[in-house]
Amino acid sequence: MDSAIQSAKRIIIKVGSSLVTNDGKGLDTAAIQKWAEQIVQLRALGKEVVLVSSGAIAEGMQRLGFDKRPTGVHELQACAAVGQMGLAQIYETSFRQHQVQTAQILLTHADLADRERYLNARSTLFTLLQLGVVPIINENDTVVTDEIKFGDNDTLGALVANLIEADALIILTDQRGLFSADPRKDPHATFIHEAQAGDVELEAMAGGAGSSLGRGGMLTKILAAKRAALSGAHTVIAWGREEQVLTRLAAGEAIGTQLTAQTAQLTARKQWMADHLHTAGRIVLDQGAVLKLTAEGKSLLPIGVIEVSGSFGRGDVITCVDQSGRAIARGITNYTSSEARRIMRKPSTDILSILGFVEEPELIHRDNLVLL
């Protein structure tokens, strides 16, 4: 297979906690130094690298004397706050040995959901890369709650790939890559060297406790690859303990599973809409409206809406679902939730008589709508 990493100019590398900590108890300085060495070698090949690294909570636990991971939200946030200092210090020291500057960037979903903050983060990252800096990104665990978390750094890595239009996403994990079934349980499981990002069969294999691949965190990686593919980024899932894995990938060696992006690249504006993990509201569409959106590329009219939930204002991003609850699209609404409830199931010609004004004949214009 063609190596997505060898030809990539801009790469996001996600390193999981198990690869930068001592069995979850504090940071592994030697391991981090090796990652820094490999990234420096990638930069020498002319590649721009952004690192998404876990490990802050594990380091904070050690510094604060926790024997096991706390269950309280505030204790976890305290561990993250303390541990992030150590994580930044070790990365800075490791890269400065090679005369490379690093930058710490902590993101939340709110940063990427707000259009202005999204563009600011994008501009900052581009500027850092132009200055030859290696940005090191993590979720800002000190301020987020479960309801607004990215959920995992696989997802964060994909969102950053989209944010700066990276060519490739490398997800380093404690497994070799993807198998057709859980190799720990099925001796006939075969290794998947290459597949298409967004392959529904692959998602089905990895989904849920009863799936053939088991849980094992692989579904989040498959979904991250699907998300990264929206901006044209290819994904490689590889074993992080593989010797010199990054430099060998950059040299064109086939390691791990490569999930290839084959979908049309979204515009930057539509990419921003697609990357909303949490939207302001949800509307349910009838079958006719679903077909108009998915098969004909039409705008969404009020007559095709059968239910409105949530509280949203004009200009908010909302999710469109079919009657089974499956997400079909996201888009920027022309009407508030209360207005949408009044005009749903009505023809656009009735909007003026119902509301006393007409913003637009469409609830969501097709230029402000992205299919999922």
UniProtKB/Swiss-Prot annotation:
Primary localization: cytoplasm
Enzyme class, broadest EC rank: transferase
Domain annotation PUA: ranges: 280-358
Disulphide-bridged cysteine pairs: none
The organism's place on the tree of life at top rank: Bacteria
Any Pfam family hit: AA_kinase
Functional pathway: Amino-acid biosynthesis; L-proline biosynthesis; L-glutamate 5-semialdehyde from L-glutamate: step 1/2
Gene Ontology CC annotation, any one: cytosol
Subcellular location(s) per record: Cytoplasm
Keyword Nucleotide-binding listed: yes
SMART domains: PUA
Entry GO MF terms: ATP binding; glutamate 5-kinase activity; RNA binding
Positions contributing to ATP binding: 14, 173-174
Keyword Nucleotide-binding listed: yes
EC number of this enzyme: 2.7.2.11
UniProt keyword annotations, A-Z: Amino-acid biosynthesis, ATP-binding, Cytoplasm, Kinase, Nucleotide-binding, Proline biosynthesis, Transferase
Annotated positions binding substrate: 54, 141, 153
GO biological process: one example: L-proline biosynthetic process
Reactions it catalyzes: L-glutamate + ATP = L-glutamyl 5-phosphate + ADP
Protein family membership: Belongs to the glutamate 5-kinase family.
Described purpose of this protein according to its UniProt entry: Catalyzes the transfer of a phosphate group to glutamate to form L-glutamate 5-phosphate.
Name by which UniProt lists this protein: Glutamate 5-kinase
Species, as recorded: Herminiimonas arsenicoxydans
